[in-house]
């Protein structure tokens, strides 16, 4: 398995422009994860012009466009009531991310379960599973993987994967989220967590 050093483009304003690819390459960065952008701005990464710029710059400097992150679900929760404005917006963001990934040749989308999409109880888990199932159904026929990023322990993560029951669903494990919340127990089950990562 090859290891790539990557960065998320929302962590610093300078990384939000495709022109950052040159500096990333010079710094030894191999890959970048792109944010779809906000619903209020009509998901900027959906723009063909912006997509073209990212693809051209990434190809020129050998930077892998690794994933489309759907940060819009941090505000418009996947756990919101089905049919509500927030849930509808989350589902539109998911569909837009799948389209972007397919159009740009990006292999996966990432759906974070934090803030408005945090999984706090069984109802949240059920609604998250429904959104993940929608994402997987949209993504599967386009050859796109769906990564869920959350704070579930390994038993609950495996349960979520089984509930959704799509082979294009996997886990995106960011250990910093666990450490920042005092959840060092994740390290005890690290091999099991890594087994379901994409």
Model region roles, listed by residue range:
Residues 33-58, 113-120:
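Glycine-rich, proline-tolerant flexible connector loops at the mouths of alpha/beta enzymes
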Residues 1-6, 13-30, 59, 105-106, ...:
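Histidine-acidic metal/acid-base catalytic patches
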């Amino acid at each position: 398995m090859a290891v790539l050093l990557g960065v998320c483009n929302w962590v610093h304003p300078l990384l939000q422009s495709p022109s950052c690819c040159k500096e990333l390459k010079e710094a030894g960065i191999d890959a970048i994860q792109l944010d779809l952008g906000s619903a209020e701005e009509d998901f900027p990464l959906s723009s063909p012009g912006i997509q073209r710029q990212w693809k051209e710059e990434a190809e020129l400097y050998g930077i892998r466009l690794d994933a489309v992150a759907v940060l819009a679900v941090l505000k418009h929760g996947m756990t919101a009531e089905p049919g509500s404005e927030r849930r509808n917006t989350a589902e539109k963001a998911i569909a837009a991310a799948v389209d972007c990934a397919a159009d740009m040749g990006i292999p996966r989308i990432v759906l974070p379960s934090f803030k408005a999409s945090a999984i706090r109880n069984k109802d949240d888990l059920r609604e998250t599973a429904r959104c993940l199932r929608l994402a997987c159904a949209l993504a599967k026929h386009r050859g796109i993987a769906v990564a869920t990023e959350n704070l579930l322990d390994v038993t609950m993560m495996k349960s979520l994967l089984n509930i959704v029951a799509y082979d294009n669903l996997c886990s995106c494990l960011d250990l910093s989220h666990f450490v920042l919340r005092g959840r060092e127990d994740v390290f005890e089950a690290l091999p099991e967590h890594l087994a379901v990562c994409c």
